[in-house]
Amino acid sequence: MEKFMLIFRGGINHAYNATGSEAAATNMQAWLTWMQSLGKNGNFVSTDPLQPIGKQVNGTNKVVSDGPYVEANDMIGGYLIVNAKDIDDAVEISKGCPIFNENGKVEVRPIQKMEM
């Protein structure tokens, strides 16, 4: 098995958009159910949501600015590391993600193995 990162972008019902609402609770349950199924199948490795605030450090002068400055539908809300046999398998795993119910998207990226 190889490791892949699923990067979650956009979505209308992220916890930071709908905290305390019925939509947020329903959305969170869908995510938990999906991730639990990945755990049972041996695909789940790790995950963390991201807060919508941050800083950017840019260029050779290392200029720091508030960020991220992206369109809402491109905001990275979190990521998930999965085990999959290949990228096609990882893409199939991503298709079960609840973010598609929120008009979001998933970027699937292979994680490069590194010797330390």
Predicted regions and their residues:
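Conserved, structured core segments of small domains
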Residues: 1-116
